[in-house]
Amino acid sequence: MAVLNIYNLAGEQTGTVEVNDAVFGIEPNKVVLHEVLTAELAAARQGTASTKTRAMVRGGGRKPFKQKGTGRARQGTIRAPHMVGGGVTFGPHPRSYEKKVNKKVRNLALRSALSAKVAAGNVLVLDYDGIETPKTKVIVNLVNKVDAKQKQLFVVGDLIKDYNLYLSARNLENAVILQPNEIGVYWLLKQEKVILTKEALATVEEVLG
């Protein structure tokens, strides 16, 4: 079974924990990772880009000049797509870019991403009894001690209990704090170190195991 190191808030290793190989020890499926990552990035798009067709542009109701006798090419409206100020042909309109991803496929992608992180030694467990008052320097000291100085993904099990941890970590420039139900492939791949609280680890194993 895969084994994760357990640390306290001081950054000292206090033990290890065996985790479910079905969640943290599988062979990463790159095809599924790409599919789910693409879907997550697509779903994050606003989809508000909009243009007006010739039917939507103001004006252009009358023929700009007579059909014959001017020597110019015939025109029926000043709002045709080839005219300055005219409508746009095949331009974007508000739409949803979301792609359907089956639950089993998404879970496989999450397990693949977590397994890749574990194989690289970039997942650790945080065991602590809470923080009395929010202090960013406590978290700075922690990430320095566990060699997680670059980009950190904190996964907390209970945002009420872990609220001071959230307040302490959110000041870090490259830190992201999520709950287990918010974890996505994008953040697992983007952030260098994944730091799970014990409660979050139990939830992740229960949901994905």
UniProtKB/Swiss-Prot annotation:
Region feature (Disordered): 50-75
Top-rank taxon, per record: Bacteria
Cellular component annotations (GO), alphabetically ordered: ribonucleoprotein complex; ribosome
Alphabetical GO biological process terms: translation
UniProt keywords, alphabetically: Ribonucleoprotein, Ribosomal protein, RNA-binding, rRNA-binding
Biased composition, class Basic residues, residue ranges: 60-71
InterPro entries assigned to the protein according to its UniProt record, in alphabetical order: Ribosomal_uL4, Ribosomal_uL4-like, Ribosomal_uL4_dom_sf
Hydrolase is among the record's keywords: no
Listed GO MF terms: rRNA binding; structural constituent of ribosome
PANTHER family (alphabetical): 50S RIBOSOMAL PROTEIN L4 (PTHR10746), LARGE RIBOSOMAL SUBUNIT PROTEIN UL4M (PTHR10746:SF6)
Assembly behavior: Part of the 50S ribosomal subunit.
Family assignment from sequence similarity: Belongs to the universal ribosomal protein uL4 family.
Entry-linked HAMAP family: Ribosomal_uL4_B (MF_01328_B)
Protein function: One of the primary rRNA binding proteins, this protein initially binds near the 5'-end of the 23S rRNA. It is important during the early stages of 50S assembly. It makes multiple contacts with different domains of the 23S rRNA in the assembled 50S subunit and ribosome.
Name of the molecule in the record: Large ribosomal subunit protein uL4
Organism: Fusobacterium nucleatum subsp. nucleatum (strain ATCC 25586 / DSM 15643 / BCRC 10681 / CIP 101130 / JCM 8532 / KCTC 2640 / LMG 13131 / VPI 4355)
